Amino acid sequence: MIDEFKTISDTVGEGYYTEKRSKFLAFAHHVTTVDEVKEIVAGYRKKYYDARHCCYAYMLGPERTEFRANDDGEPSSTAGKPILGQITKAELTDILIVVIRYFGGVKLGTSGLIVAYREAAIDALAHCEEVTQQVEEIVTYDFTYPMMNDVMRIVKEMNPHIVDQTFDNTCTIKLSIRKSEAEQLRTRLKKLSFE
């Protein structure tokens, strides 16, 4: 079970690489959805409308199962895959790297393109702050008011984040806790119901 994952902070990491007068501008973003990816890529296409290519790669989710590499007109697997390769090598997720290419008039060839896009991605990652995030799970528990002290004792001991709580005839508490500890929290709370 994946309990934590590596990603980057919300600060955009910028990279730059030149090869035979072609300029490669790279930008690394923290993202969590495909819609965010589309919005950011569209923004770069609009901002750098005069650039020849806007290639990108992304990886999403703690399990790192959702990913895509886009060559945007470059020869197959010469742009998106090298960018994705750097994301994979760094074991990052919830990340998008966009590389903008301004053509310098000299063709780089397949290997030259692979190196250029890879190096631009490496430079963008070098200017990012890497962070480790926990995979959280929400646990909701309903209990009667007389059980309050016991519930709060468990909350204090296990230290989950209290997302929401309502205290009435029937009380409800909504907790966010590290995924690996969620089952233990559920078990301890359920035991209170039978005491």
Language-model features and meaning:
Residues 54-56, 130-139, 165-169:
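Interdomain boundary/hinge elements
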Residues 67, 74-108:
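Ordered, amphipathic secondary-structure segments that act as subunit-interaction surfaces
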Residues 151-157, 184-193:
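Short amphipathic alpha-helices in soluble, non-transmembrane regions
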Residues 26-30, 137-143, 170-177:
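Short cationic amphipathic helices and targeting signals
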Residues 48-51, 158-163, 190-195:
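A common structural junction motif
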Residues 1-77, 164:
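C-terminal regulatory domains involved in ligand/effector binding and gene-expression control
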Residues 175, 181-184:
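Terminal, non-globular segments
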Residues 96-99, 106-150, 154-155:
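Glycine- and Gly-Pro-enriched alpha-helical subdomains that act as flexible
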